[in-house]
Amino acid sequence: MALVDAYKKVVDFLNNNGYSYFIIGGIAAGTLGEPRVTADVDVDIVINKKDVPDFLGKAAKAGFKVPVKKCLKSVEQVGVFQISFSDYHIDFIIASTDLESQAYKRRKSIQLHGVKAFFPSPEDLILMKIIPGRDKDLLDAKGVIIRHKGKLDIKYLKTWAMKLCDEAQDMRIWQALNKLLKD
């Protein structure tokens, strides 16, 4: 069993059950930017916390390994949860920010590994990668910038970077974006 099988399984599950989602993390970075190794599937999902138990039940019936108590505790504490398929983890981040709300309106359907899945726009993935600020995330953002050079909505990027900086009262995101756009 390979990571691609876990990816296909979760995408089919989400699509067949009508969940609103998009793929993020290393798979999105490799699809929209430069390919890189990743060991899991990361999903941003629109779901009310009260609906997570039903989601977990459906996932278990679909063949995923679901540590229900651990998932529910994690949802309450940090708004994320993890299930698995074979040896691969699938991390779900519950959408909760204005940027995620906007990204859902702009998401794109992309055929990858024989299944259609939703991915954020290149601009939204760049912003989502800059926010944590880890080296690998900044490299992912740079890869997306390089791949979409001349096609990015720079005004959108800068508007959201400034908004995020205002909310955080920290200019790091603005500075990181401008550095990545210049390099």
Each predicted region: which residue ranges?
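Compositionally biased terminal segments of proteins
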Residues: 1-183
